[in-house]
């Protein structure tokens, strides 16, 4: 399998039997929006596929439950920071479940790792990669200026202009970023440097460093908006501490737009996941994200949502026709995990998750199954529906194509057919209503 690495700007081979993976999690001060869902759906599709190829996954995600935004939210709502973070952590996990996203193997709250965070920062100070200044601690970029910005591609002199950084006259160098900040507001912890809180960029790298035992991980995933400064600053801290790369492959998903406009609070077009799910099929967002390569920007338009709805309508109708066809022809269906269609699916997925071609393959399968039903051809029917079901399952679509039924359903359907044949329409209509309710007609 090959995946596009943002650092080398090339597709890199992934040929391991065990994959260590990290994806940046949410800062839990609000409900997540559909842009936040893109990287976690990307990881879900990737890990489901790798598992289908018998590859073991060790997937870690953080939850940032200490942050200035959480403090402000707590003050505005007259609640504690813990109450805010617990509320939105619960909401985040519920959103994952609603989107049929498998939870990571390990989720770690940043607040649970404060002692380790302080030690990590102290270690960077001890090796002169960071320095303390009046209770604040900053990373010393000048020591690593030959490595810094290799991920984002920015030039240091462009950043120094102040366009991409916050200017702080206290620092040795304007690009030096905060590892520990002295504060008297909100929850704080004691440290070698005094009372304060860790910087956001240190939180993720500490978890990676500790959980994966100071080793380079295979894949780091996140949105393109986090490439700089967050991922850049994660990477440089890991290099400073361990003298090795943080990740072999950096996966970055593209930006989202809503009807050709940037999603932003000022435009009032931010769509929360929980609201999107109430309005649309729970699988719609996944289908939308799969229509284009994950690295590309994506415009979510009314037309694209309409196309998604039509896709699921096709599958619903196909499910009904498939069950009827199986009953009429008394077919025995067994699950098949090997076919030319599944081989083609694997080839597309191996090519940097070429999911747009996968969706085309699914459409071809739907057309072929419909043709077999129309022409009453039962040859290869088992292979066709098994291939379709397998591919949809690996992609993480839930309850979109069902060809299984109980013995009672078969008996009811055959009885209905006989009543229609015998022109006992009143009795047939009663059974027909039952079959419609159960999704057979």
From Swiss-Prot:
Annotated residues for binding of Zn(2+): 24, 204, 230, 234
Classification via CDD domains: CysRS_core
Cofactor, free-text remark: Binds 1 zinc ion per subunit.
Short sequence motif named 'KMSKS' region, residue ranges: 262-266
Catalysed reactions, semicolon-separated: tRNA(Cys) + L-cysteine + ATP = L-cysteinyl-tRNA(Cys) + AMP + diphosphate
Magnesium found in the keyword field: no
GO cellular component: cytosol
CC cofactor: Zn(2+)
Keywords: Aminoacyl-tRNA synthetase, ATP-binding, Cytoplasm, Ligase, Metal-binding, Nucleotide-binding, Protein biosynthesis, Zinc
Gene Ontology process terms (BP): cysteinyl-tRNA aminoacylation
Sequence motif: 'HIGH' region, positions: 26-36
Subunit structure: Monomer.
Protein name per Swiss-Prot or TrEMBL: Cysteine--tRNA ligase
Source organism of the structure: Mycoplasma capricolum subsp. capricolum (strain California kid / ATCC 27343 / NCTC 10154)
Lineage: Bacteria, Bacillati, Mycoplasmatota, Mollicutes, Mycoplasmataceae
Gene: cysS
């Amino acid at each position: 399998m090959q995946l596009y690495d943002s650092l080398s700007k090339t597709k890199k081979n992934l040929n391991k039997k065990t994959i260590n993976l990290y994806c940046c999690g949410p800062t839990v001060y609000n409900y997540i929006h559909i842009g936040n869902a893109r990287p976690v759906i990307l990881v879900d599709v990737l890990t489901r596929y790798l598992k289908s190829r018998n590859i073991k996954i060790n997937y870690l995600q953080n939850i940032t439950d200490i942050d200035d935004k959480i403090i402000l939210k707590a003050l505005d709502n007259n609640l504690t920071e813990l109450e805010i973070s617990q509320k939105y952590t619960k909401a985040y996990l519920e959103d994952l479940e609603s989107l049929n996203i498998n939870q990571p193997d390990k989720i770690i709250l940043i607040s649970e790792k404060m002692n380790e965070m302080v030690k990590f920062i102290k270690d960077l100070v001890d090796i002169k990669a960071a320095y303390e200044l009046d209770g604040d601690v900053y990373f010393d970029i000048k020591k690593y200026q030959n490595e810094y910005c290799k991920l984002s591609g920015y030039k240091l002199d462009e950043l120094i202009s102040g366009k991409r950084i916050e200017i702080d006259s206290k620092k040795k160098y304007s690009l030096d970023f905060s590892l520990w900040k002295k504060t008297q507001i909100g929850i704080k912890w004691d440290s070698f440097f005094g009372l304060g809180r860790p910087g956001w960029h240190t939180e993720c790298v500490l978890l990676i460093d500790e959980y994966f035992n100071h080793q380079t991980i295979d894949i780091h995933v996140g949105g393109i908006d986090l490439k700089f400064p967050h991922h850049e600053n994660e990477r440089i801290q890991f290099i400073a501490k361990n003298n090795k790369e943080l990740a072999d492959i950096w996966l970055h998903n593209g930006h989202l737009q809503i009807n050709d406009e940037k999603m932003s609070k000022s435009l009032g077009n931010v769509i929360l996941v929980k609201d999107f799910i109430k309005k649309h099929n729970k699988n719609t967002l996944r289908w939308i994200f799969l229509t284009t390569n994950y690295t590309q920007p994506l415009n979510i338009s009314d037309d694209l949502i309409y196309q998604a709805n039509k896709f699921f309508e096709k599958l619903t109708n196909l499910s009904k026709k498939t069950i009827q066809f199986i009953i009429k022809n008394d077919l025995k269906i067994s699950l098949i995990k090997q076919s030319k269609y599944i081989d083609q699916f694997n080839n597309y997925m191996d090519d940097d998750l070429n999911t747009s071609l996968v969706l085309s393959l699914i459409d071809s399968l739907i057309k072929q199954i419909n043709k077999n039903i129309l022409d009453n051809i039962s040859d290869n029917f088992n292979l066709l529906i098994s291939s379709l079901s397998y591919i949809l399952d690996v992609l993480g679509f839930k309850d979109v194509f069902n060809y299984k039924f109980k013995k009672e359903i078969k008996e009811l359907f055959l009885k209905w057919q006989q009543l229609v044949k015998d022109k006992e329409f009143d009795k047939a209509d009663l059974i027909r209503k039952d079959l419609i309710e159960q999704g057979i007609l």
